[in-house]
């Protein structure tokens, strides 16, 4: 284990934020229903909205804690973040130049106070959502920042990049530590529901588990034969779910460290995964749409077709009633349970 290394932060050019709104409605979409006897928590989803406004691929999505606002980040040199009201279907905010090029990842802190974004300009940017202003940039990474995670108490922010993993104090807005330097490229991060464990997935198919309070590596293991594109903890904290470019999704028992289930069904890379807050439904995204799985049985329940190209990002709302998706077709779609 390398020792903690303190890094620096700086404030950079102020991104532009303004608030606006227009009404959008759902585009054509289909739902393929696979006969199943398994119970469904996210039952009979229907397309509620289809948002247009980005100039490139949607790389990241996040809901506010009250599920009333959806935030989307655009890639391909767009660097724009857009905010959408999920009750009215209106766009209510835009942050131009949120990142100099692509917005690789974004999140809203669990307390709802802070929006965080990162990109391949090596910076992390913070906004105060209560007062609608830019607050600070964290600078310390020397390469593309690909992933973000925040602790349940909104105190610790973790960032993953081509040069490793760094930790930041989100409340005091200062750097905390560097866990790994110049390791494999960190594509995805997740923090356990109790805030004690950090999971990272890299471009070599390796997953590592860290003690978030000490920064010590608990264990690492080769999980997939290709890049780990997404990791997420189940709400009970007992299982880690990983998705990969090897086309598989795996469920890992955190007590034994063994695979409890392997889910197959995507015809290409698994780009993103998300778990409904009740822990019953897993969503996965790829070239062939969005697949909904019964997390207990591993059974494929439904496939949602709404995007005309790869689906690159998905997120469940905290109230468990909506699933948002973003794709290479530059659209953001919101599905609602009926």
Q: What are these model-predicted stretches?
A:
Residues 3-338:
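WD40-repeat beta-propeller superdomains and closely related acidic/aromatic-rich repeat-like regions
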